[in-house]
Regions:
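Catalytic, metal-anchored helix/loop core of enzyme active sites in primary metabolism
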Residues: 1-334
């Protein structure tokens, strides 16, 4: 199934072109960025500067450099379309609305360990963390879902995608993952987007927008089998990664870039059995505490902060307890 405007046979003559060159190529009008970490930042910027429509699944790209990306999109009349199910849901709920909403509500499954005690969380193994109760994802995002870091990154994403203040973005635990997000309006009414948890739907919608394509391969909700839709408040104490992410987003500057980089290192260390599950938050927090924030960073300063954070997180994982100094820890606060 292809939209007529998609060119599945596009041929560049067998050359392997740099991702930035492909993303900004004159024959390309639609770019999907679905990478892990900062590797997608360069191609995303290149595409936006070339005025392309970018469907973004790489949350780290927007978290790290959201202000720069949104600015470039506005300058070059480019579009950023969300692929994440939660942001796609909000995007769909906002269509046709002229009034600014009162609040955005992101839902989270809670991951496999939401009702674990602190002692149980400390004993979680990589093998356990890689079994998500609802979604089938890559290793990094699956672990981030278990720590709820993923939901914190999505709060920062929502802030940039929808130009919405952090204090008006809420989170609800919704184990069934049927409601993907909700929007509350000034009159107290709510809109929600519901569907079976299947990433093919938000991906397809980004491709088909502003139309909707029929796809018999996508599962439908059977209301005869859905007995309840449950919700719980978020427990920030047992899942500190979520709180760290939201606070980093509110503080802004280079903090979100440092958050992403430190988390990426910590998750890799956990997956290789070198640190425990609860050490992920400890390392991320320690890295953020040692960082000297730049309030309005350039792209080069964001990349320097990313590199510094990776070194600091690695150093902390080895038992470092003194301040981690390095020349590219972005200078003095400003």
């Amino acid at each position: 199934m292809f939209c007529p405007s998609i060119k599945p046979g596009l041929n560049y003559g067998g050359q392997f072109l740099p991702a930035e060159e492909i993303a900004s190529h004159p024959e390309v009008d639609f770019v999907i960025v679905a990478t892990v970490g900062k590797v997608g930042l360069g191609p995303t910027l290149a595409a936006l500067r070339a005025g392309k429509t970018v469907a973004l699944a790489s949350k780290e790209v927007l978290v790290t450099a959201g202000e720069i990306l949104v600015s470039e999109a506005n300058i070059h009349h480019a579009q950023i379309l969300p692929i994440d199910s939660e942001h796609s849901a909000i995007w769909q709920c906002l269509q046709g609305e002229k009034s600014k909403p009162h609040r955005l509500l992101l839902t989270a499954s809670g991951g496999p360990f939401y009702h674990y005690s602190q002692a149980q969380l400390a004993a979680v193994t990589p093998e356990q963390a890689l079994h998500h109760p609802v979604w089938k994802m890559g290793k990094k995002v699956t672990v981030d879902s278990a720590t709820l870091m993923n939901k914190g990154l999505e709060v920062i994403e929502a802030h940039w995608l929808f130009s919405f203040p952090f204090d008006s973005i809420g989170i609800l635990i919704h184990p069934q993952s049927i409601i993907h997000s909700m929007v509350e309006f000034m009159d107290g009414s709510l809109k929600a987007q519901l569907s079976w948890p299947d990433m093919r739907l938000p991906i397809q919608y980004a491709l088909s927008y502003p139309e909707r394509w029929a796809n018999p391969g996508l599962p439908r909700l059977d209301w005869n089998k859905i007995n309840s839709l449950d919700f719980e408040p978020v427990d920030y104490d047992r899942f500190p990664c979520l709180k760290l992410a939201v606070e980093a987003g509110k503080s802004g500057g280079t903090y979100p870039a440092v958050l992403c980089a430190a988390d990426e290192v910590a998750v890799e260390l956990f997956l290789s059995h070198r640190i425990g599950f609860t050490d992920i938050a400890r390392i991320v927090q320690g890295t953020l505490e040692q960082h000297r924030r730049i309030s309005r960073p350039s792209l080069e300063e964001l990349l320097a902060a990313d590199n510094w954070a990776r070194e600091c997180a690695t150093w902390l994982s080895l038992g470092g307890n003194r301040k981690h100094e390095r020349r590219d820890n972005p200078g003095t606060k400003r």
